Every structure is written in C-alpha cells, then in structure tokens.
Amino acid sequence: MNVQPCSRCGYGVYPAEKISCIDQIWHKACFHCEVCKMMLSVNNFVSHQKKPYCHAHNPKNNTFTSVYHTPLNLNVRTFPEAISGIHDQEDGEQCKSVFHWDMKSKDKEGAPNRQPLANERAYWTGYGEGNAWCPGALPDPEIVRMVEARKSLGEEYTEDYEQPRGKGSFPAMITPAYQRAKKANQLASQVEYKRGHDERISRFSTVVDTPELLRSKAGAQLQSDVRYTEDYEQQRGKGSFPAMITPAYQIAKRANELASDVRYHQQYQKEMRGMAGPAIGAEGILTRECADQYGQGYPEEYEEHRGKGSFPAMITPAYQNAKKAHELASDIKYRQDFNKMKGAAHYHSLPAQDNLVLKQAQSVNKLVSEVEYKKDLESSRGHSINYCETPQFRNVSKISKFTSDNKYKENYQNHMRGRYEGVGMDRRTLHAMKVGSLASNVAYKADYKHDIVDYNYPATLTPSYQTAMKLVPLKDANYRQSIDKLKYSSVTDTPQIVQAKINAQQLSHVNYRADYEKNKLNYTLPQDVPQLVKAKTNAKLFSEVKYKEGWEKTKGKGFEMKLDAMSLLAAKASGELASNIKYKEEYEKTKGKAMGTADSRLLHSLQIAKMSSEVEYKKGFEESKTRFHLPMDMVNIRHAKKAQTLASDLDYRKKLHEYTVLPEDMKTQWAKKAYGLQSELQYKADLAWMKGVGWLTEGSLNLEQAKKAGQLVSEKNYRQRVDELKFTSVTDSSQMEHAKKSQELQSGVAYKAGNEQSVHQYTISKDEPLFLQARANAANLSEKLYKSSWENQKAKGFELRLDSLTFLAAKAKRDLASEVKYKEDYERSRGKLIGAKDVQGDSQMSHSLQMSKLQSELEYKKGFEDTKSQCHVSLDMVHLVHARKAQHLATDVGYKTAEHHFTALPTDMKVEWAKKAYGLQSDNQYRADVKWMKGMGWVATGSLNVEQAKKAGELISEKKYRQHPDALKFTSIKDTPEMVQARISYTQAVDRLYREQGENIKHHYTPTADLPEVLLAKLNAMNISETRYKESWSKLRDGGYKLRLDALPFQAAKASGEIISDYKYKEAFEKMKGQMLGSRSLEDDISLAHSVYATSLQSDVNYKKGFEHSKAQFHLPLDMAALVHAKKAQTLASNQDYKHPLPQYTSLAEDLRLSCAKKAHKLQSENLYRSDLNFMRGVACVIPGTLEIEGRKKASELISESKYRQHPHSFKYTAVTDTPNLLHAKFSNQITNERLYKAAGEDARHEYTMTLGLPEFIRAKTNAANLSDARYKESWRNLRAQGYKLTIEALPFQAARASGDIASDFLYRHDFVKERGKLIGPQSVRDDPRIQHCRRMGQLQSELQYRRGATSSQAQFHLPMDMVHLVHAKNAQALASDHDYRTQYHKFTALPEDLKMAWAKKAHALQSELRYKSDLIGMKGIGWLALRSPQMESAKKAGELISETKYRKKPDSIKFTTVVDSPDLVHAKNSYMHCNERMYRSGDAESLHRYTLIPDHPDFTRARLNALHLSDKVYRNSWEQTRAGSYDFRLDAIPFQTARASREIASDFRYKEAFLRDRGLQIGYRSVDDDPRMKHFLNVGRLQSDNEYKKDFAKSRSQFHSSTDQPGLLQAKRSQQLASDVHYRQPLPQPTCDPEQLGLRHAQKAHQLQSDVKYKSDLNLTRGVGWTPPGSYKVEMARRAAELANARGLGLQGAYRGAEAVEAGDHQSGEVNPDATEILHVKKKKALLL
C-alpha cells in the first residue's frame, strides 16, 4: 500500500483521515489555519502561498486597522530605513565595485539554521547563570501574586496572542516564508525532534531500548559520516570574516527581536504608550532613533567618504550595524552592562513598591493581562469613526510607501540601476550586484520567483528540500532498520587521521632517506677525514682478531702470584665464611657449650615443663578422682579455657614458651640484629607518613628540606643507639667536588705531563682568561700566601686553654673509644649493679613481691580467713586496687613510661651509660662539637695519609666487623670506569646523536651500489611505497571483473541480511507460530505423550502402585526395570546419541524446531559441505588475494554461525604489520642489530687508508703504551727503587695487629670464656627478681597448687566462690579485648628479646596477603613499559635487589667468578684509558699544532662551558655574591618556632610532665559507687557469684522447674561469646570505659592511624579518573615525546626542576628552613599540579 506523507507533520496519511487540497496531502487534524489553528474543511479554507487559512485570517484581506503608534509600526518604519532603506541600497550599490562577496557562501546558508539553536543555548546558559546569584530570601506577597498570575495566563495564551498580533499592514509575521522558516527551525530543533520519541518507541518498537542499543546509537552518531561532515562543512569555509556581521545574521536577529514578546512590550512601554500625533511625530522619533543608533558623527563622516570609490569597510553602514548587532549578541558585553546594573536588588529583597524590577514586571503583566486588554476594548466599543480621516490611515498610507516592494524597486530602477548596468559589466559583476540586493530576507523570498528564472538556483538548497531531507531519517524504513545494517565508515579527513598520516610520513624511513638517495652519489669523501680515520680506528678496536691478538700476547707473559698474597688469603677467608661445612663444624663444636651451666632459667623451664606435663597432671587426677565433692563448674571452666585457647588468635601468635634462651647469648644478639635489619615493618614504618604524598624530584630543595625535617622529628632517629648512627660522605657535595678538583689541580705529575711539551711551543697573551684563572689558582694554592695569611692571623693572637671545649671533647671521645678505659670503668662499677642490701631495699623487688602477694590466691585466702567473721569489711577496696593495677597494666601510657616503676641509684653504671648515650644522640650537642670546625681547611681525598687512616678505621671498626654480610649495601661510584663507560655507551646508543652523526657522515660517504644493506633498503622502499601499492591496485582495478546478481557474494549477503534482519526473523516467526503445536490433544502429540509416559515411569508413586499389584506374582521379570534404566542411562551418557538426538522421538514434519535442526545439521554436515565443492574439481587454481577470493572470504565470515555466536573474549588481538610503530621497530632492530653492524664494519674495514699523524692514531699509540704490561712493570720498578720508610710503629701495622686480634677466633673465645661467669648477676635464683616473679606466676597458674588450695577450703561453706568467676571473667575480658591483644606482654612472662617472638612477628607480616597486596593497589591500571627501556631495566634491578628469593638463598649457592680477560673488563680498561685526563693531554700535545679547530665547534663550545662550570674563580665569586646578600633570621622565625615545638614534642621531660598531669585523671572517683566500671565489675561478680547462686538454689530446689540462668547455660553463653569470631573482632562495646580516660584517647588515635578506610579515603578523589586507550593519538604522541626526551638526555628531574624552584622561591628565602605546615602545603600544591 502506497502511503503518502502529510504536508505538515510528515507522517503517513491513511485513506480514512486523508484530505487532498492545494495540490498536497493532509491529515484532517493537520489541515488547520496557520494563524489560529482552527480545523478547516474543503469548503471553508482560503489558500495563500499553498498554506490553508480561515476567512478571518486571510492575508489577502488587509482589513485590520492598525494603531499608528504601535511598536510594530515604528519597528516596521525603522527596519527598512536602517537595514534595507534606499540610502543603504545606494551605499551598497556604490560599494559593489569595491567589495565582492558571495552571498551564497556556506556561512550565510548555515547561519539561519544555527541561529535558533545558538539563541536557545545562549538563553538557557544565561538563565542558568542568572539563576545562580539570585538570593534565597523570603518571597514577597506581590511576587507570589504575580507568579500565580503568570501561571494562570500560561504559554498557550501568549502563543495565540503572537499570531494575530502582527495583522497590521506589515505582513512579515504571516508570510509563508516566515512560517516555513519557523517550521524548519522547529524540525531542526533537537528538543522538538526528541519530543514524543519515547511514546513513538513504545508504539512502534517491540523491544525496549537496552543500554547496549542506546550505546550503539550514540556510537553510531559519533561515527556518523554525515553528522561529522555536516559540522565540518559548515565550519570549513570560515576565514577571518566573522559570522556576526553577515546580512543573514542581521535578518535572523532582527526577526528574533520582532518575534520577541519581551522586546515588544519593552519598546511599547518605553516609547509609544500614551503618544498620539501626526506623521511628523513618527518622523521625529525615527530621526531620534537613527541619531541614537548611529551617533552624531556618522552623517558627517559618511558625507566625507560618500563620493570616494574605495573606502575602508570599518565605516560602512553595514559594518556599523553589524558591530552594534555583535555587541547586542555578545555575552561579554551583556554581562558587563549586567554587572554594572547589578545593585542591591540582586542581593536584598525590597518590597514591591521600591523594587524597580518588580514594578516593570507588574506593568508587563498588565499588558499581557487579558482583563486589561478587554477593558480598553469595552471602553472603545461604541464609537463610530471615519476610517479615512484617522491618523492611523494616513500613517499606514505613508508607511506603505516605504514598505511597498514596487515603490522600492521603482526607485531602484529609476535612480540606481542605470549607474552600474552598462556594456562593460560581465555576468559575474551582475550576479554580485544581484546577490547584494538580496540582503533583506523578506525581499529575497518575495523576489524568489524572478531569481529562479534568471539564475541557476539548485533545488537542493530550498527550505522545503532541506526539511524533507531532515525528515528522511525519521521514515519508518530508516528508523526501524537493524543496527547490524549500519556500516562503519572511516572518516579519512579527521584531524587525528590527518595527524597520523603526517606522523607516518615523518617517521617514514623512505622519506627520511629520499633526499639522501638523491644526493649520495654527488659526494666524494677524502681519505683523511677525521671521522673516517676514527671509524678505522674503531674498527681496529672492535676487531676480534686484534682483540685476541692482544690477549694472546698478554697471556704469554705470565705473572707471579704467591700463596700468601692478600687476595688469596681474603678469598680463603671469604670462602670459609660462606662455607656451609665450616659453619656446621663450628656449630657442632659450640653445640654442647650453649647450656653449660646449671642455669636457674633452665631449672625454671624444667619445672614449668613438669607442671604442664600430662603425666604429672594425671598423677594428681588419679589421687583426686574418687572424691565426690569436686565442684562441677571446674570442668566447665577447664573446657572454656581449652576452647578459648583453640579459638584464640593470641596463643597462635604466642609460641615463645617452647624453650628458654639466654638473653646474653651471642647468637641471640646476632639474630636480633639480623631480624632488625630484615624487618619489613620497621623498614616501611619510616615511609608510612609518606603514603599518599605526591612524587617529588630527587635532590630538589623542598625534598631535601622535608628529609631534614623528617630526620629532626623522627622518633626512631631520636631514640636510636649511638652505634647505629652511620657516617656517610656525600660524594657529590660542593666540598667533595672542590676537593677532587683541587687534588687534580695540585697533582704535579698530571700538571707537568700535560704542560711540559706545550710550555716551550706556545705563547699566551697576558689577558687570556685561562691565564688569569691560572694566576688566581696559583694565588689560591700558593703556600707562601697561605702561610702569610696564617701568620697575619697568628699575629693577632688568640687564647686556647687546656680546659677549652675542644680539648675536653677530644679527651672525652678518646676515653669513650678507649677499650682500656671502658673496661676500667666496667670493673669499677661491676659491684654496683644491684645496689641493694636485701629485697626490701630494692623498690622494684619490693613492688614485685607486693604484686605477687596481691595476685596470690593463698595470700588472698589468708586475708579472707582473718576477715571473714567481720561483717563490716568494705569489699570494694580490693576491687579498687585491682582495677587500678589492671588499668596500669592495660594502659598504653604505663607501657611507654616504664621507668617510673623503679628507683635507680644515681651511681648506677646503666644510668651513667644511658646519660652518655643520650648525650651522644643529642643533635644539638653533636652539632655543637662540630661548630668549632667551621671554616677549617680540608684534607685532600686520595692522599696517602687519608687513605691509610680510612683503611685503619675500617679494619678496627667493631661495627663493620660484626655486621651481617647482607647489611652491606651496594653503592655506585659515579666516576668509576664502568659508570663512565655506561654514560659513553648511552650517548652512543641515543638515536638522536646517532642520527646526527649519520647526517654528518652520509654527505662524505660513497657506498657501493650492490651492498646488501642498499639492496635491502631498496626492497623495503618498494614494499613500503604507497605509490607501488596503489599502482598494483590500479592495474588490478583496470582489469575489470564481472559480478552478476546471482553471484555467491550477493547471495551470501542477502542470506546474511535475512538472517540478521529482525523483520525477517519476526515474519518467519509469525508464519511458524501456528505450527508449533500441531495436535488436537495431548495424546496426539508424540512428544508430550512421551514426556508424560517418562514422568509416569520415573514417578515413585506409580512405581510403588505397580509393585503392589505385582509383588505377589512370581513370574514378573524384575530385570526389565533395570534394563530400561540402563538403556536410558546409556542414551544419556552416549556421545553418539548426544550428537544425533532427533531419531529418538517422532516429531511433526512442519515443526519449527525440526526444520531449524535440519538447517543446522545441513550447515554442520561435512559431507554436504564437501558435496557442494564437487563441481569445482579440476577448476584452475585461484591466486589468493584476488577480488573474488576476498569477496567469498568476507561473505563466509558474514554468514559464519560460529563467528556470529562466539564469545567476545575469544577475539584475539592481531597486530597490523604495516603500522608506523611496527615498521619503526623493524627498522630500529635493523639499525641496532650488532651482527649487521659488524658485517658492515667488516666490509668497510678494508677500504680505508689511515694517515699516521691523526690525533686518534696518536691516542691509540698512547693507549697501547698505557696498556703495555712491560711499561707498567717498568714504572713499578722505578717507583719501588725510590723506596720509602715504614716502621713497625706505623699506623697500618698497628691497625693490622689490632685487627688480627679482633679477627682472631681464639682471642674471641678466650674473652668469651673469661666473661662467661659474669653473665648472670645474682648468686642464686632467689636473688633474681625476674626468676622469682616467674616462679610466683608459675605457682599461681599451676593446676596442682590450685587443687591444693581447693582441697583445703572445699569443706568450708562460707568460702565466696565467686572469686573464681571473677578471675575467669577478667581473663576472658583480657583475651577478648583488643587493648590487651595489643599489649599482650602482661599476661605471661616472656623474654622480650626472645628469638621466636620477633620471628613470629616477621612471619605473620610476611604471610599477610592483605598487607602484601595493599601495597600493590596503587599500581592498578598502570600501563606497560617497553622491554629493555631504562625504566624497565631499573625496575628489574630494583626487583633483584629487594627479591626475597635471592636474599634468602644460601651463601654457597652464590658463586663469584671474575673473568680477567672478559670483554667487559678489557673494554672498561680501554675506556678508562680513553677517559684518563693525563694520558689524553700527553697524547694530545703532539697533535695540538697539526689541527685547526673551528671556533664554534660544539666540542669547543662545550669545553668552554665545562671550564666555566668547573672554574674555581666563578664558583667563589658566586658564593661571595650569595653571601653578600645576607638574610634576616630572628628568634621568632618560623623555623625556630618549629624546631622549638618539635624539641618539646620529642622531649622526654615534657612527656613525663604531661604524664604526671594526666595521672590523677585516670581514676578520678571518690568511691566505687561513682565509677561505672567498678560498678559493672561488682554487678558481674554478684551475678557470677556461686554464693548468691546457692542461696537462690536453696530457696528454689524444692521446685521442679529449672531456671534459664543456670550456670551451665550461662557458661555455654560465655564460651560461645568467647569462641565467637564476632565478639573477638568487636570487643570494644563490652566494657564500660570512662570517655575522658587517657588510654581510650590513645587507642582512638591509634585506630585512626591504622584505619585502612581513612587511608584510602585520600585516594577517593582520584576515582573515576579516566584511562587513555593504548595506541590512541594522544598516547602515541606522549610516547613519542618521552622517546624524544630520552634521546635528548632529558630526565624527569629537569622537567620539574623549574616549577619547583619557582614554588620554593615563593614560599621562603634560600636560607630559611620551612616548618612542617609549609612543607605540607607545598606537597599538596605539587600533588595538585601533578
């Protein structure tokens, strides 16, 4: 059925609602008046320009009487005068010869379409911004009233008002062109387009839009070629001529102003209301408006330029008008005026009478109000007026002269046209003139019929065609098509693709070598070019033959190696150290000596083992098991204990009771040290505060300041022992660099060797900078000048007493370092270690005894026996004391201030030693000792004395001797031959330098034409050539081919289209729908009958029924059921039936599933598939890649069911081999290929002739001399012949002797045996408070002791049994409490330095999967790095360094072998010889006068810069200038305040002071009743009290019912709570805690610090930060930039150094250290910047 679209709405019109009028098809509902929207019929419509109107609104009947002073008439008059009047036409016609501008440009055509969208967007933007600052004050009653009035009027009224409003003499509002443009704007509007879309979707689409469908639609719009090119075409032709001043823009803007309701009423209110007068008034108003609009100076300037032919476009009326329109449309200008006008009304709510805005809104409402409108109508209804005499009629007649198109054209034809139309004008000029006259949109559309005859105006540009084209996508066929039909089109001219093409051309090796290929045959390379000579020399250096030749010569000379050489002895010693056999041998020797004394601790361990022994336990059990009076609740407690130990994590972590180790054992201390070094937690603890802090460049000012501040406030550094402070010499500090440089300058050998030859051959000018610098250096290094200044200083005199600080400090340091002094003090103070006559004299022991008595059950029972007969005892005192003690044990404060628990003698050696250690650790005292050295001279590093002193210090260092081998860290020395060679290799491997060198060489080099590389390059050029590629394609394309409609690709595409088509699918589905169940009843359907029968067979009820019937009959073959079951099982398990399931039941032939299965089997059938190919047998071979083959491949891929159905994860990534990246990688591989490089070197090696006098040749000779073994031994003999004096008292001998004693195992054991008896201080077990305490605790915890006490007291009825429950509750609380979990050392007595304890902590930290992976969370989503890149190599190296596997491997598995003749070492030696300054200068002296260096040579320039950088004079001058700048450092400066505050924080005195203040706040109650905790404990004690329980039991035992709170149930509940993981993890709500308690605050703070959520909350701001797809344009650009930066030697440090220097300069001066807050602010800023 042919359904035609409606002329108004565009939808299809069916016969029932069809009207055919005005040569068009309409819906009945759409056939309405254009003005009032009244429904029309065939009989009552009036046609005007093919649009229907009612009789009342017929545009032809101009019967409406217009009021003369309406704003519309004034606008009508102003509009033709200002924009399209006669004067402007004259100006335009005069300017036509000067300016030629095509009015049909893309800008003009696009402007009307864009204008409504742009206005709408700008309007809503302005509305949103204006909304933002409106105050939220209370609404005024007037405002509320007006809002309601506006709502009642509504938008429909204003729409109806808009259309009849313009029914005056100006027909712009009702012209067909205006209505058509308005309709086109509505159609083009995205809002109008989308309105009703959801309803239409629900009506016409069966499937709701899924997210995938919506996403694909959005993607299709993004990928749409039409959308993309449409925007691009609109913007493509724009140059520097702004769209704001085009006539189309002016017309559209003016039309918007005319159509604007607000503008209409504003203009009317401001100018016209209340005025009445003749036409002169209108003229005056017009003149005034023109004067206001264009200014006074415009006519004068216009008259000046009027007669001139060419005048600037800046003063044309069109330009002025456009400028004014631009200002009106400009958002910036609008906001400027708006901000000026913004007054109090915007920020305060005035009453309605005072608010000007409200007054204006009220007046507008009155105008819009229908009541006001009808009032005037009622008042004027009864008057009769002669229309011809009214001023309005005269005004209209006057206006009609100006608005008449005939009059306008008459003036134009009479006055203007004859000036320009003549013989000399060609058609282009006439066309330009005609285009200029079409500036008015109204005149343009009125004159459209004339233009279409004269000029070729294409139909595709008409509004109706554009509208129809916009409606094409809305058609049902296009709208309902499947997504799969939309094909992806690659837009070839997108900026990204264009940029990629440019990049590919830039990266193209062919383009790169194109110029070279043209010019390479035009150069002749001389034989003596330095580069050529250097290449030959390099070829010799890299020659394998030469290399082996030198090695053979060296090998044949031999060398002398004695058995007592230092290297052999060191190797033996290291081998013994690393030897597993030696290690085990020493271990076996010392194994029996570890427990060589009757140690009281061992006895204690044996005693504890007996107590915990099962045998001992059973002995006691055998004795007591026959007694009936055992309290039954003991079993429950025992069970609860066992359950708690099983469920508790604490016992899992406390494995330390298994054995006892001596704390002074050497192995224990050594293990402690090793574990401290290995501790991952301690290592990472220093870095915890840096979590989340941004990345900073190493070495920057802020980073160094932050490091220093971190060291100052570090608790670890403050508390650490003296021997852990390491002295590290900063190798790259200015002092060290200066010292190195001075050493080189002072070296007489190097100085004379380099200058000896040039002294007599060179004349230097006196004012040469180097000469002046040498003089200055000589003055600086002059011994005489140095001593003269010293003598001058000495003459002034100074006083140095024997009691000065420096002497005293030196003495003190000597005494500290002296072993004799140390042992002397130790011997003196050895007897003072205990310092108490008896236990009562020692406060600590007394306190321990008192604690043991308090905790002792026996003591408690003794006291109870004394007081049990007294009724008035206050039991809460015991609880109070116990609670205090428990609080002390549980609180963290008491843990940290442990030194308050005992009183130490002031003469105690430990106290003195601690004071001395703290004094040494004090940073202030440490720096005070160094202050006197400021300004002192320096010692040249590398001199003999310094090296001897260093070596001696290392040999006698106890710390270095005792440290673990794994603690030795690798330090890279920057100026080693390896590092220098690495730098040289890096510069050689840099692509940029390589290409620069290649560019230099390639113009002097003539390669042979048949080289393999050249042939390969040509082949590659042919392969990569786009021209060759397109040429072959063009040839193939020109050959032509025949493709019929019945060809395979077409048929396959049709079939695939039908398969994919949703419509076809549904059509087939509808056809087959009635055939699915083709039976009249269930019995007729074989499938259903089979299912019912199978169900009945499987039914247990039916089975049993049949069994009941047949069980009495003997002849039933019982094996039938099993047989059927086996068959069924076989069919289920059989693979054959699985593949061919159809024959098992009978199906209808027209069943949909059956036909689908047949189709599937046909597709899967191998025989059918191959039978199709039988007709092709004997057909000739088809070349792969032809059009037919590719077409068939594509068709088979399209119809492939497996590919269509496959999972997205099965798609594999395929690399395109001809991408620029892969081509670049291939070429880079060829360039960096060592084999090809050497092959090219071998070919080129025999074609060079070396000149003998070249500097490189001379340097090679010098290098050969330097590498010569004969020369080396000769110089050694000469040096040895000079001799030197080395006495026995020399420092090295003394150091060696001392180190021999230290390293001696015999002396070590001798000292150990001497000291062995001094390890345990007390004479017996009773003198050792620790062991006494352990014994006491063992007795308390002993089951035997407990049972003895129970036996002695079980017959007494008055014993309060609730104490057992209270102890149990305390223990359970302690186990469940997280507090006690963290401070678990109070529950048992364990040696804190126990090896197992530290090892268990380490093992748990290592086993924690969460902690391990939490460090890696920050790395999620980070991209990959190319292999062999510097970052990847450094990461590998770091991984090897921190590798746990490599770290933990046995020492004997690490084999160190130095191959003396390895290429690396030989290469390093050669490189070192190359880098040697002395040899370089000595070898260069001969070639100095044979070579002329270009003054601006890069090497020369770089040498000058290096000389400037290394210049001591410049260095000192810059230092003097910096020092002269000075700075102000007051006592109230922020660094001082920060240091003071940090000192107070770290101060132990402040800490104790704060502790003493808070100590009284911990309990803070007058009695037990005020303390909620104690009340809680008492209540718990009463509830758990056995005494109370027995009282109640005695009352209720005669009653049969059992209470729910019986002890068994309570105990089970308690056990469940203890065993429950929930209560274990949430222990905090169980106790009642004082909120002001110090321990609670501390715990809260600790939990906040440990909170993973809070830690990760800092990272939430980075959530949602997008990722960049690999391979995209920006990623490739960034990667290329990184490669270029690496190639130029730029690191990240250089990139960020400037920004950090600026920020550092902003925050503080160069000499003031920042405080902590400033550091945090700077870090936050940098994190934001990064």
Curated annotation (Swiss-Prot):
Keyword Glycoprotein recorded: no
Biased composition (Polar residues): 1596-1606
LIM zinc-binding domain location: 4-64
Cysteines engaged in disulfide bonds, as pairs: none
BP GO terms, sorted: cardiac muscle thin filament assembly
A Pfam match: LIM
CDD domains: LIM_N_RAP
Protein name: Nebulin-related-anchoring protein
Organism: Homo sapiens
Gene encoding the protein: NRAP
